[in-house]
């Protein structure tokens, strides 16, 4: 009796959603990823094409950056910058959503800033920079927002080692 092959996450074929198909039809290279637990479509793009794709999605109606954030896949692995976009309109009973992910090499975590498309990215990109060290090129004021200016390292990276001591000077 032949052994049945069951797809694994690495081999499973993900059907492209409407946004991924629209991007592909308009010449924007992307990869459809598995939808999240709420059914939100997720697309992966390269950092070199993030800005043109972000501008195209804005023109396509994704006028609200609900959330920008980052996460670490683990020591020695990629960092991820993600963008949760929503189409907001007066007549939408269920707004369309999409999440765009950019996987960045740990040794060179640079991605263009989307601040010039969605102004709400300002503090969100700063927080992601502060916690993960992802550099948002073209951001007008990329500096720490949560940690002290002289803090060393990126506290939410999985390979981060907490300092034994940090002296807070001129705190009062």
Swiss-Prot record:
The keyword Thylakoid applies. It comes from the Bacteria. It is an enzyme of class 7 (translocase). InterPro entries: NADH_DH_suC, NADH_quin_OxRdtase_su_C/D-like, NADH_UbQ_OxRdtase_30kDa_su, NADH_UbQ_OxRdtase_CS. Keywords: Membrane, NAD, NADP, Plastoquinone, Quinone, Thylakoid, Translocase, Transport. The keyword Translocase applies. Its EC number is 7.1.1.-. It is found in: Cellular thylakoid membrane. GO terms for molecular function: NADH dehydrogenase (ubiquinone) activity; quinone binding. GO terms for cellular component: plasma membrane-derived thylakoid membrane. Its main location: membrane. GO terms for biological process: photosynthesis, light reaction. It is a peripheral membrane protein. It catalyses: a plastoquinone + NADH + (n+1) H(+)(in) = a plastoquinol + NAD(+) + n H(+)(out); a plastoquinone + NADPH + (n+1) H(+)(in) = a plastoquinol + NADP(+) + n H(+)(out). NDH-1 can be composed of about 15 different subunits; different subcomplexes with different compositions have been identified which probably have different functions. Belongs to the complex I 30 kDa subunit family. NDH-1 shuttles electrons from an unknown electron donor, via FMN and iron-sulfur (Fe-S) centers, to quinones in the respiratory and/or the photosynthetic chain. The immediate electron acceptor for the enzyme in this species is believed to be plastoquinone. Couples the redox reaction to proton translocation, and thus conserves the redox energy in a proton gradient. Cyanobacterial NDH-1 also plays a role in inorganic carbon-concentration. This is NAD(P)H-quinone oxidoreductase subunit J. It comes from Synechococcus elongatus (strain ATCC 33912 / PCC 7942 / FACHB-805) (Anacystis nidulans R2).
């Amino acid at each position: 009796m032949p052994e049945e092959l069951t797809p694994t996450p690495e081999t499973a074929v993900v059907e492209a959603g409407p946004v991924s198909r629209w991007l592909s039809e308009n010449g924007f290279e992307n990869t459809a990823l598995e939808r999240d637990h709420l059914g939100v479509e997720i697309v992966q793009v390269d950092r070199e094409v993030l800005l043109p794709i972000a501008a195209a999605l804005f023109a396509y109606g994704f006028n609200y950056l609900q959330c920008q954030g980052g996460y670490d896949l683990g020591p020695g692995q990629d960092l991820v910058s993600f963008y949760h976009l929503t189409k907001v309109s007066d007549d939408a009973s269920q707004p369309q959503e999409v999440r765009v992910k950019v996987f960045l090499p740990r040794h060179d975590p640079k991605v263009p800033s989307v601040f010039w498309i969605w102004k709400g990215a300002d503090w969100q990109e700063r927080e992601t920079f502060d916690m993960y060290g992802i550099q948002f090129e073209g951001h007008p004021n990329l500096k720490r927002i949560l940690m002290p200016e002289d803090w060393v390292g990126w506290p939410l990276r999985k390979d981060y080692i907490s300092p034994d001591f940090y002296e807070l000077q001129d705190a009062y």
